[in-house]
Amino acid sequence: MRILDWVVAGLLVLLHLVIHVGFGVGAAAPDLFTLALLVVARECHMALAAGLGWTLGLLEDAQGLLAFGAHGLALAIVGALAARSRELFVGDSLLFVASYLFLGKWLRDFVYWVAVGSGFRPPPVEALVVDAGLAALYMTLVGLAVVFVTGVLQGPRGVGS
């Protein structure tokens, strides 16, 4: 495992908390928890990625009052699938990284939408096409900037590298 990936993920988590909790920016800020999870999940085992996703999700859930555990479930599933993606997809091209980040964020929003319950969720077209699509695009652009600056998600992949 590369230390750089873990350092960048830790900084993304810290930045997420500062922006969302410290400054109270809310939905106008990118989802850096998901970005941090996607960066680290390609480097670790499925159980560790799911556990990290669950932990980050509980931190996210602690900031809100409704549907406690829905963020934890969503990030745990995304972390587990992202860790498995290392065995299914090999590559570090710009197209792959952009697709990986976009689909990871969109899947997180989809699982959250399903887990939150019908009483609290918006209509599917609004939530999954408009809101989740724009949020995934926003996080992908921020993620690509992080990739270019730090070099994470590039180079040799795998648990043994």
Positions of the model-derived regions?
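Terminal, non-globular segments
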Residues: 1-161
